[in-house]
Amino acid sequence: MAYQNALRWKIGGTKENADAAVRILMSWANTCKGVGGDTNMSLAAGIYGHEFANAAELMRDYEGWSAEDFTKFKQWIIKVFYNPSIDFLRRRHDTWLNARYSSLGERPGHYWSNWGLCNALCVMSIGILCDDVHMYN
């Protein structure tokens, strides 16, 4: 709902849309401490991380979002989404190190391309949000 409210505000919505988007983004930043679970957390981090980053990017110039809260949000998104996404892109849960093939047909680096793509999109989106060329590249 943060993205929908942010987009609605950006294309001519009301202050209520903007306030709702910021409230939702900051509620997540103040509550969520990480993405957990099995290896599927990498897929979740990639998908949801870029969605949060895009919503925040739309709200970047909203006067109702304080610089302090915007900075806090960026720190949160790096910790919760950027770090696991870049780790997946670098290590792929160490499946590249696994040289043996299983009877299930798994190969080293066996994750489907959508896993890498959504994590690359997450990393790039957060790099843009944080104005960080190193992250983006």
Where do the PLM segments sit?
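Aromatic-lined, polymer-binding surfaces characteristic
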Residues: 1-137
